[in-house]
UniProtKB/Swiss-Prot annotation:
It is found in: Cytoplasm. UreD, UreF and UreG form a complex that acts as a GTP-hydrolysis-dependent molecular chaperone, activating the urease apoprotein by helping to assemble the nickel containing metallocenter of UreC. The UreE protein probably delivers the nickel. The gene is ureD3. It comes from Methylorubrum populi (strain ATCC BAA-705 / NCIMB 13946 / BJ001). This is Urease accessory protein UreD 3. Transmembrane segments: none annotated. GO terms for cellular component: cytoplasm. PANTHER family: UREASE ACCESSORY PROTEIN D. One of its GO terms (molecular function) is nickel cation binding.
Amino acid sequence: MTLHGPLGLLDTARELRGFRTEPAQMRAGAPGKVGRLRLGFSLRDGVSVLHDLYRVAPLLVQQALYWDEAMPDLPVCPIISVGGGILQGDRYTIDITVGEGACAHVSTQGANRIHCMDANYAAQHQNVTVEAGGYLEYLPDVTIPYRGSRFLSRTEIVVAEDATLLYGEMVLAGRKHHHAEERFGFDLLSMDVTLRRPGGRKLFAEKILIERGDPTIAFAAVMRGFDVFANILCVTPPGTAARIKERFETNFSSDAPRAVSGVSRLPNAAGLMLRAVGVETYDVRNEVRRFWRIVREEVRGRPLPAEPYWR
């Protein structure tokens, strides 16, 4: 890949062997199939602004909006996919930087749909940087890998010691109400995250790898009885992490629970990880919002607005 070097390196991932056939319609990474987005936020005259915006379709951000009534100084940027989802051969790069003392919220306009594939795969590389005293909420909507799809995502995160990042992914195991074979019917879902300090010290790395036919999916304490999962990172100073963990109540009921969730500490005193599973997306989203509300209150001293009506 000439547009973005690290994106080309993803093709060497072990799990992609057997998925490198070129699509018949348009070759992988052709013009129109490489989306790029760069967002830079900084503090200017006491206000956080989107000072750097670069986009290449099918990824699009138009401008920063200030619609969060609880944090009117928070620039909000919904990422729009003009292609209506991710197709075979698509390659995306997303770079987000929050400067010193600035804050931002980045989300998506709706679910991230990964369409059915008969050749190749789709890949995404993300760089997320939060500088000293910065605060970023990067919470994309749920990812839905369709039957037969192959998707690989790599996220590299750099967070200063006194900054806070709330980032994570929610995944629905296919279009569960569309077809009996949709549930975990995708060929490949590979998502890895690496967290470092500005000096390069690695704090944490995790990889989720689900391949078609993996029997562990049906195990108890994995996904038996559930169709949605979420992993949400809260990278924050140790004192703040301790207060958040103390306030968050583990949700675990032995009586046919709609959702199960809990918080654990990240290695190297880097922060916290929320893990949640649920029956439907709204069950898991409720757990994410419960965690999100506590994080915002402890870090910024601001409440989380009620769920928008369009949700």
